[in-house]
Amino acid sequence: MKKNTHPEYRQVLFVDSSTGYKFVCGSTYQSEKTEVFEGKEYPVCYVSVSSSSHPFFTGSKKFVDAEGRVDKFLKRYSNVRQPAQQPQPEEDALPAAKGKKKVVTKKKK
């Protein structure tokens, strides 16, 4: 069996960025940053949403994203719009078909 194939499982400090709530949980998360929490030093993982800030757990309706992804995109690139180039008809480039089309039928035996 190969050794050192699995990441190290250890206690990690998770910090909710929006509320500042901290909790320790076992994880394989790798981090260079560490913080002291309740007298012990832990690697730190910053999360944007946790049980202390998620509307399902808090019971409040907190609107996180004021604009949708499409609105942000349109706002960012609205001044860059360029008119689309119309393809030129290439009637002269194609030769006109001459003669009749061949119809292929099966012969009866």
Curated annotation (Swiss-Prot):
For this protein, what is any one GO molecular function term?
structural constituent of ribosome
The record ties this protein, via Pfam families, to: Ribosomal_L31
By its UniProt entry, which InterPro entries does this protein fall under? Ribosomal_bL28/bL31-like_sf, Ribosomal_bL31, Ribosomal_bL31_B, Ribosomal_bL31_sf
Segments of this protein annotated with the region Disordered: 79-109
Here the segments flagged for biased composition (Basic residues) are: 98-109
**According to its UniProt record, which protein family does this protein belong to?**
Belongs to the bacterial ribosomal protein bL31 family. Type B subfamily.
UniProt KW keywords: Ribonucleoprotein, Ribosomal protein
What is said about its interaction partners and assembly? Part of the 50S ribosomal subunit.
Q: Which organism is it from?
A: Chlamydia pneumoniae
In its UniProt entry, what is this protein called? Large ribosomal subunit protein bL31B
Q: Does the keyword Ligase apply?
A: no
GO CC, any one term? ribosome
The protein's matches in PROSITE patterns, at most eight in alphabetical order, are given as:
RIBOSOMAL_L31
Output the GO biological process annotations, alphabetical, semicolon-separated: translation
- What NCBIfam families does this protein's entry cite? L31, PRK01678.1
